[in-house]
Amino acid sequence: VNANVAVNDHFSFGGMLAHVGTANVRMGNGKKNNDFDNVYGFNAKYNVGKLDVHGEWVKASGLSDSDIWNVGAKWGNYKIDKKNSWAVGLDYYDQAKNAPIFKTQKYESNDLQKTTRFEGYKAWELGASYAPEKNIGINAYYGFNAKTQEGNRVNDYYRADLNFKF
């Protein structure tokens, strides 16, 4: 269940609840099954013109060290169906070691060091999006200053994707 409310033209907030059950999924802590039944979270966004400031917090029920939050800012008005639209953004992520992270487009563990410590992580991520043609989007991300929750340095990371809207 996901609900979002626009308070006015500039501010919105929302919440979500997902029943996960006993699905056998790979978690951010390296486990291949989960220790919880539900995931819940809240988000908020404020925008004025091309500026967007946002944040989100998510937690697994009944599991310690299982929250993840992020805050960020974005400048631009990227829309994949609008030719030459663009946006740039900066986000900060803080993920506890047992956070309910299923493989997403975000970096979710410290296994870039080829270890199995899975201590959670904290990192900054710089992103940019551009639509060179209608319904074609190019996105690039660079994560930096990443550390585990215990303060161990994690490699910087980057990725790019090309999206088509049909």
Question: What do these predicted ranges mean?
Answer:
Residues V1-A3:
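Mobile, glycine-rich extracellular loop/lid and propeptide segments
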